[in-house]
A protein has these predicted regions:
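Primarily the internal scaffold of c-type cytochrome electron-transfer domains
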Residues: 60-75, 82, 90-162, 170-172, ...
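Bacterial N-terminal signal peptides that target proteins for export
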Residues: 32-44
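Extended acidic/polar, glycine-enriched regions
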Residues: 196-211, 220
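Bacterial N-terminal signal peptides
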Residues: 43-54
């Protein structure tokens, strides 16, 4: 999410520096946050993000043709999850518990998983004089950066939570209609606060802008009001990943199903997308929108609709021997390099049912054993049927991400995430074998 010419705060020197190293004295600060001693907000980076202002367009065609769609569908094209739940109550209730549904939410005591209790609410940075305190106040929750040398501080309120907490969370705040990322995140794998990925070591700043592409993968709907790139219309921001991100705009479908004359007809309703009926490539494209690694937008955000060709919207950088797919963010690229993928017709949904909360790794093994005989495993002779639940741990182990890192006082932290290139990982297999043998 970092912008290459963003400005950073160095509280130790009590100045701000741009990326070229120029020092700019702080003289004033005017915003909603709690401030002391004249801290000022760094100048906003003005990025050239062309075509980000949506305009009203006609009702989306049921064939989801991408030829002329250069703007996002209007809010009126979307029915909302509540409308879906009226007929799909069971699916809706299960889906509410999934990481996708909870991928973004308002910041509350329930949605923020990091601790605000004494002894667990302080993030020590690589700068011994700089800490970030997590503060619960009557009017909300705050991140407060403190210079211990002189007790000067800069604080902003948690407004939006990004991430269900399955792996971690990052937090955003509003300054009027401008959206920014906060400097402290929470990682579940080490159960603690960390400097947000990409932030410099020993520094804290509150000026990392949230661009439309960020929200395209972490929200259901928004209206960009760029420039600057982080200006959004607050009253129509829909958090979480809702039904219509994978099924397409649903207003026409709801109207169809509510019609007394054609309700529940046997004829396929072409006004809604059933991903299971898409071709293999289009199914993969639906996931690739947010799980294809390094991409460059071709068209404005939210113009992609389920059933579209992703290459009309994103320029996807293919993996190479020098740039293999990382375990974070490029699950599709990794899967496509797997022999299981190239020798079958599998898609993401072969193993993942996005309507229900993910199972643990052991529960995925039956998907593997639907194609592979357990006796064909090289560890079968030594371990027998004990390996029946260990397919994923051996062939899709948890690996350290090279793309998502945090600069801590202990050094660079790398979160562990599930690999999606299915292959033999000798070290992982040996670890599983030792565990099963009690070694």
């Amino acid at each position: 999410m970092a912008c290459r010419d963003e400005v950073v705060y160095d509280l130790k020197d009590r100045v701000r520096k741009d990326r070229t190293g120029h020092i700019i004295l702080d003289s004033s600060r005017t915003n909603r946050g709690k401030t002391e001693r004249g801290w000022s907000r760094a100048a906003l980076p003005l990025l050239a993000w062309l075509g980000m202002v949506p305009v009203t367009v006609p009702q989306v065609s049921v064939d989801h043709s991408t030829t002329d769609r250069l703007t996002a569908p209007p809010p009126s094209a979307y029915a909302g999850d509540a409308a879906c739940a009226m007929c799909h109550r069971k699916e809706s209730e299960f889906y509410k518990l999934t990481p996708h549904a909870r991928d973004s939410s308002p910041a509350t005591a329930k949605s923020i998983i990091g601790s605000f209790s004494q002894g667990h609410n302080v993030l020590h940075t690589a700068n011994p004089n700089l800490v970030v305190n997590m503060v619960a106040a009557p009017d909300g929750f705050y991140q407060s950066a403190v210079n211990l040398a002189d007790q000067s501080r800069l604080a902003e309120r948690f407004d939006i939570v990004i991430g269900s907490g399955r792996h971690g969370q990052t937090y955003l705040y509003w300054q009027n209609d401008l959206l920014y990322e906060m400097p402290a995140s929470y990682w579940t794998w080490n159960h603690g606060w960390v400097i947000s990925p990409g932030f410099p070591a020993g520094q804290v700043h509150f000026d990392r802008v949230i661009v439309p592409r960020c929200l395209e993968c972490h929200a259901s709907y928004f209206t960009s009001q760029a420039p600057p790139p982080n200006r959004f219309q607050k009253d129509n921001l829909v958090l979480g990943i809702g039904c219509e991100r994978c099924h397409g705009p649903g207003t026409q479908h709801v109207a169809h199903e509510r019609s007394a004359t054609i309700r529940h007809s046997e004829k396929l309703d072409e006004a809604i997308v059933n991903p299971a009926r898409l071709t293999r490539d289009r199914q993969l494209d639906l996931c690739a929108l947010c799980h294809a690694g390094a991409v460059e937008p071709i068209r404005p955000p939210l113009t992609f609709i389920a059933g579209d060709n992703i290459h009309d919207y994103l320029a996807i950088q293919p993996p190479t021997p020098d740039t293999p797919p990382d375990v974070h963010g490029n699950q599709v690229g990794a899967l496509e390099q797997s022999k299981c993928f190239t020798s079958s017709k599998m898609t993401c949904s072969t193993c993942h049912n996005v309507h229900v909360k993910p199972e643990n790794a052991d529960a995925f093994s039956p998907h593997c054993l639907g194609c592979h005989e357990i006796s064909a495993c090289g560890r079968y002779v030594a371990l027998g049927s004990r390996i029946r639940t260990k397919c994923v741990d051996c062939h899709m182990p948890m690996l350290a991400s090279a793309k998502i890192t945090s600069n801590s006082k202990e050094g660079t932290l790398h979160p562990l995430l599930r690999a999606h290139q299915i292959k033999v990982y000798a070290e992982a297999s040996e670890t599983v074998e030792r565990s099963l043998l009690g070694k």
